Amino acid sequence: MVVSDNAQLVNFREICSGSIAPGMLYRSSHPIKDNKQEKIISMLANKARIAAVINLCDFNSGIYSKAFFAPWYNRLLKNRLVIALGMDFSVTSNSFKRKLKKALKFIINTKGPWLIHCHAGIYRTGFVCMVLESFMGAALDEVINDYLLSFNSIFESSIYATQKADSQAAMRILSVMSESMTINEQNLKQIAETYLQKTIGLSVKEIELLKNKLSGTY
């Protein structure tokens, strides 16, 4: 099995659409499952030189016992380079918005490459990545296709196989950023930036810092 197949197995891939710098941002499923490290993710994370992790699914109270099983992850955690946010699945909830702001400020205040993950690397990770890709100027079809790619992954178990996703479903999720405005190729980037400023609450300065971090110009 080649590395690309292994990466697909655990939903590990680079995000390099729009002006996101090569080798700067990655996504995956959880690096530690059932008290065992995912060896494929460990290998790929080391190869990518992951320097900080945004964990969308665990709480601080649980991540320390898990991290013990993955030395690279545990090292980052001890150096305060892992943020555990315990996000729910409701991307419109106030709790989700507050935690997304924490995730973005974590990126601003750390150095990449960054890895974003939840449990399966599909829903919560998918939404956060759509926001960042849109914000950094990715084409609409790139954003949608990246979200859907996780559903086509070999990683999908029977649990996820029953939850079919298509481009219309992805657009509905993406439209969370736009409120009542229809998203299109021309307004996607501006909608994402407005969402980060007005809904998530980043300042103008923080938005510029986030752009610089993701584009590798900091």
Where do the model's predicted regions map?
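Cys-dependent protein tyrosine phosphatase-like superfamily
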Residues: 1-115, 127-218
